Amino acid sequence: SSCIGFQPENRNINFQSSGDNSNMWVFSALISAATFTSTAVYADDHGSKGMNVPKIGSMVVMSGLENPWDMAFTADGSMFYTEKCKGLSVKTASGKVNALYGMKDSKGYASAGNDLFCSGQAGMLGVVLDPNFKKNNTIYVYSTSSKYHGSGCKTNFEKCDGNIVMKFKVNKDLSKVSGRTDIVKDIQYKPFESNQPFGGPGAHNGGRMAFGPEGYLWVGTGDRHRGVCPQDNSLVCGVVLRIDADGKGHPKNKIKADKRFYTYGHRNVQGIDFRPTDGQVFTAEHGPWHNDEITALVNGGNGGWDPHEKRAGRGACPDQYCGYEPNQMEGMTPAVRAAYTPMSDTRFDDLMFPAWQNNGYSQGTGSAAFLTGKNWGIYENRLATGIMGIGFGGTPGGMRIDIVDLSEDGQSVKSVIHMPVGVSKRFRGLEMGPDNALYATTDEGEIYKISAQ
C-alpha cells in the first residue's frame, strides 16, 4: 500500500445567513492526497497548530462486496454487515466470513427470508446489535419485505407496508441466526415508478438504526416519494421511531397519533447517532436539490419537510409529490428551489432548525457517527458524516467524509472540514469500531478502516 504525509493548505470561508434563525457555517477546504489504498495524511483544523491534530490513515479491510450498507461491531471486533441486495453477514474477529441471512434468491447463506427483496434504494439496510448483545446475542436488521403488503401496494397512492425491522438471535460461534421476530411491520414502501428524478420503486426508505443511551432503538425512515407522508402521522414514513426491543413506543414519546414516533416531517433519514458528551441525538438527512441537513432532534418535533402539492403557494406536481419541483433536472440556484419546497419549512411552529445545511447543496449525506477516543485528538466527539456525491447542473459532486464541530446547543456548527482519508468514494455507512477506528462502507463495494493517532 501507499503512504503519504503532508500539511494541507487551509482555506476558511464564512457563510452567514440572515433572519432571526441565522447560523454561521465555517468551511475549511482541505486539499487532500490523491487516491491510495492506504493513506496517512495530516489535517490542520482552521489554522490551529499545536492543538492535538491527529494523523489520519485509511485502509481497505474488505472489498468485492455488493452495495455494503451498514455495519455493527461486537466488543471483540467481529463485524456484522449488510449488502443491500444480498443479505446479512459477519466477519469474525478471526477473519472468517459467515453469510448468515439472505434475501430471496440469494445464494450461500445459512438461512434466508423469501419475503425479503431489493429494488432501487430499498433492500437490506440497517443493522444494529442489542446493547446487551454479550448476554442475549440479539441483533436487529432493517429490510424491505413483501410479507405485510396485504391488500395495499397496488398503486403509489395508498398504504404500502413494505419495510420492516427484524430481530434475531445469533448463535455463539456467529455462524447462523434464528428466531426471527418482526418488531416493526408497517414502514412505508414505494412499489412503482413515478414521474420523478430518481423515481424508481423503492425510493426514500431511510433504514438507519441506532440504540440510544436509554437502551431504546431509534429507526430512521423516508418519505417514499409520497407527498402526504412527512406531515401525516397516520403513516410510518418520514418519521424517526423510538421503540423498545419489542417494537413498542417509548412511554415519553410526545406524538399522540403513533406512540412509536419521536419526530416527524423528515425526507430521508440516513444517519442517527448520539453525542457522547450529553446523549443528544442528531440525524443526517438527504436534501432534494438543496440543503442536506444535520439536525438535533427534539421530542415531538417537526423536520419541516412537506412535499405535498397545492400547499404553500404551490400548484399540482407530478404524482402529487413536489419534492423535486420546480425545474426537475435543470440547473437552478439552490435558494430558488429552497423557497419553493423548503427542506425545513419555517411555517411550522414545531420546526427543528438544522444545525448544518451543506452550504445549500444536496450531495447525498449518508450515515453519521461521533468520533470517540482520545486518539482522535481535537476531533474527539465531533460528528463524522459521509457524503455520497450527487452532482447535477454544475453542483459540486462531493464524495467525502466531513468532520462537523457542532455547537453545545446543537443549533449551529463551529466548523466543518473534509477528513483527509485520501480516497474519494460514495461513503454510505459510518460506524465506530471497538478499536476507536471509524469504519466506512462504500457503494463501490468496500469497507474502509479509518484510523487516527
Model-derived regions, located:
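Surface loop/turn motifs at the tips and blade-to-blade linkers of beta-strand repeat domains
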Residues: 60-66, 101-102, 117-119, 184-186, ...
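Conserved beta-propeller blade signature
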Residues: 78-82, 136-142, 216-220, 280-284, ...
